Swiss-Prot record:
This is Corrinoid adenosyltransferase MMAB. Its EC number is 2.5.1.-. The lineage of its organism: Eukaryota, Metazoa, Chordata, Craniata, Vertebrata. Residues 1-26 form a transit peptide. The modification Phosphoserine is found at S128. InterPro entries: CblAdoTrfase-like (IPR016030), CblAdoTrfase-like_sf (IPR036451), PduO-typ (IPR029499). Residues 30-49 are annotated as: Disordered. One of its GO terms (molecular function) is transferase activity, transferring alkyl or aryl (other than methyl) groups.
Length: 237
């Protein structure tokens, strides 16, 4: 996966000015790209297309944005991988949402871009980061506040909750509930990194608000589509 390898792919020396994430993909390859460690070579006459596979991760190690090699099951990569999974789930939900004409599809795409920034921040563990690394991967509070505004906008249009609801309410709503569950898992992967001082607390805040946003728009989609949300009922034996 290349989510955390932007710096490794381009090289750090003389290239930090290029270390901004581009929506919806990195300037190198996005999270669908190959393994880590491959560096783009200067073009001589014709541009060469880099290979998807590089074999540099065959021994079970990957590189962080700082260039540090860690096992692939390291907490950093667990967090990065789960946020990538979340973005993929949101991409699937977005297709269903778009088919139904929901206007918040544009917000979902923007959230995918935000998750790229989250991945970049997570892939820059502070224990091995220099100031230049942190400068280009800092995750600010702005996205958190934007999510809160969106949540308030849709919540004001929804009927109040009077019981626990089950993931339901049509395809769009159910897909968004699935995204919410993945988001909660991503948050659980990030919290230990925040507690260890390896990443910014704003990352955990963002994922926390994002799960609330996904819950809210799942209900909103069900309401707009006229689909009924299923209510939890205690099973009596």
């Amino acid at each position: 996966m290349a989510v955390w390898l932007f710096g490794g792919r381009l090289g750090l020396r003389g290239r930090l000015s290029a270390c901004r994430l581009l929506c919806p993909r990195f300037q190198s390859r996005g999270p669908q790209g190959g393994e880590d460690g491959d560096r783009l070579q200067p073009s001589s006459t014709a541009a060469k297309i880099p290979k998807i596979y590089t074999k540099t991760g065959d021994k079970g190690f990957s590189s962080t944005f700082t260039g540090e090699r860690r096992p692939k099951d390291d907490q950093v990569f667990e967090a990065v991988g789960t946020t990538d999974e979340l973005s993929s789930a949101i991409g699937f939900a977005m297709e269903l949402v778009t088919e139904k004409g929901h206007m918040f599809a544009e917000e979902l795409q923007k959230i995918q871009c935000m998750l790229q920034d989250v991945g970049s921040a997570l892939a820059t563990p502070r224990s091995s980061a220099r100031e230049a690394h942190l400068k280009h991967t800092a995750f600010q509070e702005g996205p958190v506040l934007e999510l809160e505004r969106w949540i308030d906008k849709y919540s004001s249009q929804l009927p109040p909750l009077k019981a626990f609801i089950l993931p339901s309410g049509g395809k769009s709503s159910s897909a968004l509930h699935f995204c919410r569950a993945v988001c909660r898992r991503a948050e659980r992967r990030v919290v230990p990194l925040v507690q260890m001082g390896e990443t910014d607390a704003n990352v955990a805040k963002f994922l926390n608000r994002l799960s609330d946003y996904l819950f809210t728009v799942a209900r909103y989609a069900a309401m707009k589509e006229g689909s009924q949300e299923k209510i939890y009922k205690k099973h009596d034996v």
